[in-house]
Amino acid sequence: MPDAAALDSRVRAFLAAPGRFATLATIDPDGAPRQAVVWYRLDPDGRITVNSADGRRWPANLRRDPRCSLAVPDGADGYAFVALTGRVIETIDDQEVAQADIAALARHYHADDLTKAERLITRFRTQHRVSFRVEIVAVHDHLED
């Protein structure tokens, strides 16, 4: 895969906006694409962090093949989106870190209802979680200039 791609300020602002979900595409063992809607975090270094309960198909796919893509649509304008091609550069099984990641994501996605976020975090603590850090290698956006 190519070297890491830089994210311009428009793309960074779009990805950092609250309430956006990503569709993560991975590759099944037979080569078929697999998609899942996920919470994500744009990290300060321009990488993306995603988190899941371990044992699901898409985390297994990323453990086997680090290539992935994320499509992040604008919820209000179906024509506005950012598509990212990337590769996992770090798999985090450390439960202290993975649980902190999912807690931060829950609080971000439920900032308007922190009671709900805390209920989710309590449930997530009963699960073995895994985080993936994705380095972006290509960016395609369809955003207004």
What kind of region is each of these model predictions?
Residues 1-3, 80-145:
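Charged, gly/pro-rich active-site loop segments
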